[in-house]
């Protein structure tokens, strides 16, 4: 008998997700059972945790399990647990809404590519709603531990759902799937055993299936519950007993990811610290990777008892893509997030797990370059944050970076700093790099001309974060990183000594020309000088080593912050015919127009834009006319 019944509309994002999910995930529809059993396992974990401080929540039944049964006549499949359960408010919150920030933006990002969408939806975590892949109606009966009032929730997965108060003798949740006619394959004990064995053998909660008992004459004598999984937490087992398939299925259970992980590390540590860790590197970036406020972190267990999801204190922010769990004996069972923040044991575990994660990435890079490239393409931008956040591991983090380079002639970021150092020319003392808005802009920068001529490799950095990265990463393997766009660029032993004498002569020859140009520009430029870094281009602009670069100024602007004005050094190529022609001009107006045009061209090459492009076009048309 139900009372206090009401019909409520789904949150708009739920309706959209249901429709997309049913169509996108149908090809792998059996995952609904994995998701529902995983939810039941989480409910048991939460009850164990709450019962630490309130044992009465067990209500005399501490044997936690999940049961799977079916009724061929009614066409229903039921997944029941005796975990924490839900009250009316929780049912509405958990089953009628999606409490994830950015959900609307995520759904809007989905398109018409079904394969890609299914991957994205899998990363988002479909959970309970996966029931609608195979059911045209879902009924939930639940009672929260320690409460007397139970709740009924029911929906056909369309625009609304019904919620009502009911009676339920036992705590926990029953999810009843009213299967579509074409999904009756799941009303088979053999099929259910197959799926549960495939997806849920690794979880610590016993999964029981209702089986038929027969007497000696082969007649049905009754029903019984049979445990069909190992029911031992995977991470507590010996590594040699666990197959790769089991590790991958546990990853999917843990992360609710739809894809296999790239690599994992399972470690048991005893001695000064006593813990087990299981860390995974995902293959695909989650849709909310760059939302630094989004929850992330490891699942925390203390003495095999679940404590919390997303324990972010055990992994630095730049490794927020890592998935996994930590089971430790060194923390109290009543530990809270606040206690974790200021705990010496936490700091020690964080340092150890960070090292473990970085070693795992090093192993992936060494053993499987193709897989590591997949990782880098997905998570490289986040890993780059590490050089500014983790001084102790800066060099190890930097060794994992990959860059585009003049050596590879490709925008693909495949070159490590160790690769670069191994190819350095004799006498080369620095690692040379160039930052730009894009790979194309970097590859075609006039600053590269001298380096291309001399065959010196330059790293081409075009990610927005790169200017910030090189501000924190000043050296690698004892070699300084040096921007080739700086006015005080020093090639050291790579410089051409014979040319230096002729350059001194040119300095005297062009002295009055430089003074004339400096007089015209006044305070607009820091100084006007001759340069010998160019071969085909008449002029470039550069900044001093201690001054803000163009890319850093753009980074400030992108963050809505006011940056100091960048004052450039204007460098002119004395061997270029255009510079020679301008130096010979006697008409002051003509001289000013030409030198301004060269400056605007140099600014355009450096910044990609001009403050007054119309004036530039007008001046160019005038001089070419």
Swiss-Prot record:
Q: Which Gene3D superfamilies match?
A: 3.30.230.80, 3.40.50.11260, Heat shock protein 90, C-terminal domain, Histidine kinase-like ATPase, C-terminal domain
- What would be one Pfam family of this protein? HATPase_c_3
Where does this one sit in the cell? Cytoplasm
- InterPro entries xrefs: HATPase_C_sf, Heat_shock_protein_90_CS, HSP90_C, Hsp90_fam, Hsp90_N, Ribosomal_Su5_D2-typ_SF
The UniProt entry's GO CC annotations, sorted and at most eight, read: cytoplasm
Q: Which CDD domains match?
A: HATPase_Hsp90-like
Where is it predominantly found?
cytoplasm
Alphabetic keyword roster:
ATP-binding, Chaperone, Cytoplasm, Nucleotide-binding, Stress response
> Keyword ATP-binding: yes or no?
yes
| Region ranges (A) | 1-337
Q: Which domain of life is it from?
A: Bacteria
Function description: Molecular chaperone. Has ATPase activity.
Family stated for the protein in its record? Belongs to the heat shock protein 90 family.
Q: What is this protein called?
A: Chaperone protein HtpG
Q: Which organism is it from?
A: Actinobacillus pleuropneumoniae serotype 7 (strain AP76)
């Amino acid at each position: 008998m139900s009372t206090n019944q009401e019909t409520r509309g789904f949150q708009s994002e739920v309706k959209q997700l249901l429709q997309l999910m049913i169509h996108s995930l149908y090809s792998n529809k059996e995952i609904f059972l994995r998701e529902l059993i995983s939810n039941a396992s989480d409910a048991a974990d939460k009850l164990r945790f709450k019962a630490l401080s309130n044992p009465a929540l067990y209500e005399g039944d501490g044997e936690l399990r999940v049961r799977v049964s079916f009724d061929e006549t009614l066409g229903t499949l039921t997944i029941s647990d005796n975990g924490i359960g839900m009250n009316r408010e929780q049912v509405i919150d958990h089953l009628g809404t999606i409490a994830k920030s950015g959900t609307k933006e995520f759904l809007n990002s989905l398109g018409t590519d079904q394969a890609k969408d299914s991957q994205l939806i899998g990363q988002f975590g479909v959970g309970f709603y996966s029931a609608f892949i195979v059911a045209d109606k879902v009924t939930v009966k639940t009672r929260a531990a320690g409460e007397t009032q139970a709740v009924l929730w029911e929906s056909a997965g369309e625009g609304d759902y019904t919620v009502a108060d009911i009676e339920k003798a036992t705590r926990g949740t029953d999810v009843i799937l009213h299967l579509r006619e074409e999904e009756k394959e799941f009303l088979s004990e053999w099929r259910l055993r197959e799926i549960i064995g495939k997806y849920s053998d690794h979880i610590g909660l016993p999964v029981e299936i209702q089986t038929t008992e027969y007497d000696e004459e082969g007649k049905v004598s009754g029903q019984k519950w049979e445990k069909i999984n190992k029911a031992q937490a995977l991470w507590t087992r010996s590594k040699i007993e666990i197959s790769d398939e089991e590790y991958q299925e546990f990853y999917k259970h843990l992360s609710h990811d739809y894809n296999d992980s790239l690599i994992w590390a399972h470690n048991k540590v005893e001695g000064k610290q006593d813990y087990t860790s299981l860390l995974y590197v995902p293959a695909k970036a989650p849709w909310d990777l760059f939302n630094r406020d989004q929850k992330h972190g490891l699942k925390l267990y203390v003495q095999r008892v679940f404590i919390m999801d997303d324990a972010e204190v055990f992994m630095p922010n730049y490794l927020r893509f890592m998935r996994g769990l930590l089971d430790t004996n060194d923390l109290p069972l009543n530990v809270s997030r606040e206690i974790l923040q200021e705990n010496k044991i936490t700091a020690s575990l964080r340092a150890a797990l960070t090292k473990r994660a970085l070693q795992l990435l090093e192993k992936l890079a060494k053993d499987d370059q193709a897989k590591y490239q997949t990782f880098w393409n997905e998570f490289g931008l986040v890993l780059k944050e590490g050089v500014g956040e983790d001084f102790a591991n800066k060099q190890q983090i930097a060794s994992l970076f990959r860059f585009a380079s003049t050596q590879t002639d490709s925008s693909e970021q495949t070159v490590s700093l160790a690769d670069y150092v191994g190819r350095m020319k004799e006498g080369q003392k620095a690692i040379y790099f160039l930052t730009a808005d894009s790979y194309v802009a970097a590859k075609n920068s006039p600053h590269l001309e001298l380096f291309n001529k001399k065959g010196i490799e330059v790293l081409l950095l075009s990610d927005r974060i790169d200017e910030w990265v090189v501000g924190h990463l000043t050296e690698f393997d004892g070699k300084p990183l040096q921007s080739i766009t700086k006015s005080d660029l020093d090639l050291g032993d790579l410089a051409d000594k014979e040319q230096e004498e002729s350059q001194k002569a040119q300095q005297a020859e062009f002295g009055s020309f430089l003074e004339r140009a400096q007089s015209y520009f006044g305070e607009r430029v820091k100084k006007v000088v001759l340069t010998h870094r160019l071969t085909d281009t008449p002029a470039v602009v550069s900044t001093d080593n201690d001054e803000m670069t163009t890319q850093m100024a753009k980074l400030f602007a992108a963050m809505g912050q006011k940056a100091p004005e960048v004052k450039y050094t204007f460098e002119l190529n004395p061997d270029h015919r255009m510079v020679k022609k301008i130096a010979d001009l006697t008409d002051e107006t003509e001289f000013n127009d030409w030198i301004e045009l060269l400056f605007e061209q140099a600014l355009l090459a450096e910044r990609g834009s001009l403050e007054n492009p119309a004036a530039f076009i007008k001046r160019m048309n005038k001089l070419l006319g």
